[in-house]
């Protein structure tokens, strides 16, 4: 009797185990265990995070340096950048002709051109100003002209000096006091025109030309 009860309990135990595993009849339970082991494990791929670099702002001074246009050369002899403008083109023609050693036809020049050319003729350092030495040279030029005229009219008379050195010095001092309006020790072309010296020269040359 005890053996029958033990056998019944054993059968019930195996039946409970079989129902717990839910294995189909006739199928080896190890087959399911192998499938569970062979199932791939899917992992979410990790996307690498790229660091975001923020561009540093360019200093404003550096931008201005790159944006600045190339500067031109400095004006020649202190003249404005637009030297060949319509206002002084006639004067600049004589100026350029003198610098390039081009023969100048004074017969086709206006009175203003002649005045400017005469002024520039004595501007030896080409700074558009006449200093004391250049004024003396201009006076010597007048002096030589007078000597030449006197020698042509009186060929038999001996050569004589019209102005002494002291007279030339006094004349230069007088001209400076009369023409040097701003007192800088120079006579520029504007001061020359305002002084009325060209009127005296026009009296010496009625035709307006030497």
Swiss-Prot record:
This protein's record includes keyword Calcium: yes
Cofactor needs: Ca(2+)
Cofactor: binding comment: Can also bind Zn(2+) with low affinity; the presence of Zn(2+) causes protein precipitation. Does not interact with Mg(2+).
Positions of Ca(2+) 2 binding: 180, 182, 184, 186, 191
Domain of life: Eukaryota
An MF annotation (GO) of this entry: calcium ion binding
Name of the molecule in the record: Lymphotoxin beta receptor inhibitor
Region of interest (Disordered), ranges: 29-80
Membrane-crossing segments per the record: none
Coiled coil feature spans: none
Tissue note: Female salivary gland (at protein level).
UniProt GO BP: immune system process
Consequence when changing residue 123 to A: Enhances interaction with host LTBR
Organism: Aedes aegypti (Yellowfever mosquito)
PROSITE patterns registered for this protein in UniProt: EF_HAND_1, EF_HAND_2
